[in-house]
Amino acid sequence: QPSNGVSNNTKDTLKIANKIGYPVLIRPSYVLGGRAMEIAYDDKALKFFAETAMQVSTNNTILIDQYLENATEIDVDLIRDRDGQVFVAGIMEHIEEAGIHSGDSACSLPPFSINAEVEDQIINWVTKISNKIDVIGLMNTQLALKDNQLYVLEVNPRASRTVPFVAKSIGLPIAKIAAKVMSGEKLTNLIPSLERKKLETFNVKESVFPFNKFDGVDLILGPEMKSTGEVMGIDKNFLSAYIKSQIASGNNLPIRGNVFLSIDDSNKNRLLPIAKKLKKLNFKLIATKGTRNFLQKNKLD
């Protein structure tokens, strides 16, 4: 797990954050949708976020976690029966980096960049966790992969919002199967094989946002959920599946026009290859002052 701590006052929150090291993820306990969840990069921001989080929390308790920058987030849904048999229904790789709420991030099933060794490690970990907590039915686990190291972010012994997407992707009614398992039936009597079969298509879930309906809404995604729906794209090729998901969500991908770029200093080098590709495709680049200066220094106008 990432380094973490629990607090119920601002003073202790600051101590924990400085011990862990910035940036940190701060959130109230027992809330859904990432409400009042924020990423703090210094003491000033942390104080403000801590006071807000304590107001939202039912018992003033707030959780402080090390924020894993530039990590890949992974969702896993499984079913476990009373005999300890486990069926890993789906391993989903998020397209947005860890730190974007899982309900807002697009994801692919199967993963598009995670190697088989890491997938095997994920299956091993989630199986052990489900056995340790003795879950009967569905369990969702959220993990992060950074520098080839896996971290467990969250374990939910319940159905997740990804269940309908996983069911459509693998062609099994996993909610119905989980309900029967909770009633005492065995997985081996409900599923032909507990081994995960190789999927013939990439299935991409994309979120739908209401930004065009509400003026003044912050468009920047973060730990607090903003989406109001989801769609999926299916294709034998990952990129084609992703494009289909974008079109389904109402994002018609342009082939010409302007692209607005604005990014913090720590991520500017990661922006450069993207900006070069956009320029090669004849898009006009528009940027904030700092980003513009960076692009001009790298011979991009």
PLM feature spans:
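Short, ordered loop/turn segments at secondary-structure junctions
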Residues: 9, 29, 36, 143, ...
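Surface-exposed amphipathic alpha-helices with a cationic face
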Residues: 18, 274-280, 292, 296
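Short internal beta-strands
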Residues: 260, 283-295
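ATP-dependent carboxylate activation and anion-phosphoryl transfer catalytic cores
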Residues: 20-23, 33-34, 39-255
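Glycine- and Gly-Pro-enriched alpha-helical subdomains that act as flexible
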Residues: 251, 256-283
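Short acidic loop-to-helix transition motifs that present clustered carboxylates
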Residues: 6-12, 45-46, 69-71, 266-268, ...
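Active-site rim loops that border cofactor/substrate pockets in soluble metabolic enzymes
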Residues: 257, 294-301
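A conserved helix-loop-beta module that forms one wall/lid of the active-site cleft
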Residues: 1-37, 298-301
